[in-house]
């Protein structure tokens, strides 16, 4: 914010003209206050202003001048009070504030109170920025105020830190905690660099082996500490930390251990992965039957593999039951009693069909070296076959020479 160098004005006795008057000389700086303000990074003259002194100002000698200056300053400051400023906080430049006459400061403060509907307002120095003075409702700043020297300082963060520190009451230690604390120094001296976890394990074993007299003594000490705490804080109640606040270190250690113990790829490639549902399911399945046939082996009743193929009616019956009209559009391969091996069983057994359909290949197909025709010239003419009324024998005759 730019610094405005307003001169101090005074009215003539007649009140008709306004003349400029020189500013009074600045008083000597109070070094004690300056040192106190130094902790906040301040030390200028403006910071020494006693905001509380506005309540006990002497009578204004020039009320007309105060009214004019109050209007000028308020018009400049009130620009910040838009609808976006829900807290109704005005930020003033410290240098501008330092040259404002005291009665003008009080006039701006009273105007702010009127703007707030009669609610009390106050000035305060911002604890984070020494060049800023805050004018805001008292209810907003009063609980966050710190007095430095004679100056009011608004420091919300300090209040939050103090409130947190006051609310945190340490949990009274039990007998074992006191015992561990007494043994920790000796264990560390005897075992340099020992981790705290190992100390806990060692002291736990030592505590179990201690005599009843020693354990009773630590129980007595723990009871005394708890009694003192309850006397100082009668309403104390231990509240465990939420699970989200606990640092989950154990799962990370477990995952790191799993990675370290994992065998490289290929060492146990035949072993199933534990907990893998896919591997477990595959292990429970029966091995698939071997339906392979030698290249020159004929399909006979002894080695017929059609029974290994799902019966066609398993799917064809479901289709026709759900959609009766679809049966008119299905080729004979989907009819009941048909399997993919039926049409070629006769071919492999050397049969050529019953109705004498000539399926001889064209001359172009007799020798692959002399092939000059189109690919369609090597295929049998099956365009006349009726896929709706045709039989398996008709289809077998068409492909009988293959």
From Swiss-Prot:
Lineage, uppermost ranks: Eukaryota, Fungi, Dikarya, Ascomycota, Pezizomycotina
UniProt name for this protein: MAT+ sexual cell fertilization-promoting factor
Domain of life: Eukaryota
Region called Disordered, residue ranges: 246-272
Protein purpose: Controls fertilization, probably by determining the mating type.
GO biological process, one term: single fertilization
GO cellular component: nucleus
Annotated PANTHER family: SEX-DETERMINING REGION Y PROTEIN, SOX TRANSCRIPTION FACTOR
Organism: Podospora anserina
Keywords: DNA-binding, Fertilization, Nucleus, Transcription, Transcription regulation
């Amino acid at each position: 914010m730019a610094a405005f160098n307003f001169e101090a004005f005074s009215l003539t006795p007649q009140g008709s003209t306004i003349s400029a008057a020189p500013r009074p000389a600045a008083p000597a700086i109070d070094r004690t206050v300056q040192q106190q303000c130094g902790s906040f990074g301040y030390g200028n003259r403006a910071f020494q202003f006693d905001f509380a002194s506005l309540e006990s100002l002497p009578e204004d000698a020039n009320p007309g001048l105060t009214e004019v200056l109050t209007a000028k300053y308020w018009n400049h400051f009130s620009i910040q009070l838009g609808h976006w400023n829900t807290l109704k906080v005005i930020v003033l430049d410290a240098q501008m504030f330092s040259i404002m006459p005291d009665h003008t400061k009080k006039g701006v403060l009273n105007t702010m109170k009127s703007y707030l509907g009669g609610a009390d307002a106050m000035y305060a120095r911002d604890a984070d920025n020494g060049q800023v003075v805050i004018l805001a409702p008292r209810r907003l700043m009063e609980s966050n105020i710190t007095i430095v020297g004679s100056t009011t300082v608004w420091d919300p963060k300090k209040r939050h830190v103090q409130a947190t520190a006051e609310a945190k009451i340490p949990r009274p230690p039990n007998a074992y905690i006191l015992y561990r604390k007494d043994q920790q120094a000796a264990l560390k001296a005897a075992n340099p660099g020992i981790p705290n976890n190992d100390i806990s394990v060692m002291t736990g074993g030592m505590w179990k082996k201690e005599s009843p007299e020693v354990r009773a003594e630590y129980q007595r000490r723990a009871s005394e500490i708890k009694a003192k705490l309850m006397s100082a804080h009668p309403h104390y109640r231990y509240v465990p930390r939420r699970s989200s606040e606990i640092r989950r270190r154990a799962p990370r250690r477990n995952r790191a251990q799993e990675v370290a113990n994992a065998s490289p790829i290929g060492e146990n490639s035949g072993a199933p992965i534990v907990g893998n549902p896919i591997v477990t399911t595959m292990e429970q399945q029966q091995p698939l039957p071997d339906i392979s046939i030698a290249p020159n082996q004929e399909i006979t009743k002894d080695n017929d593999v059609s029974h290994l193929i799902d019966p066609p009616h398993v799917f064809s019956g479901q289709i026709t039951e759900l959609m009766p009209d679809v049966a008119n559009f299905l080729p004979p391969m989907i009819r009941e009693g048909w399997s993919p091996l039926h049409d070629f069983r006769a071919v492999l057994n050397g049969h050529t069909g019953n109705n004498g359909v000539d399926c001889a290949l064209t001359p172009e197909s007799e020798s692959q070296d002399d092939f000059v025709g189109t690919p369609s010239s090597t295929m049998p003419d099956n365009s006349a076959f009726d896929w709706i009324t045709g039989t398996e024998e008709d289809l077998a005759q068409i492909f009988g020479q293959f």
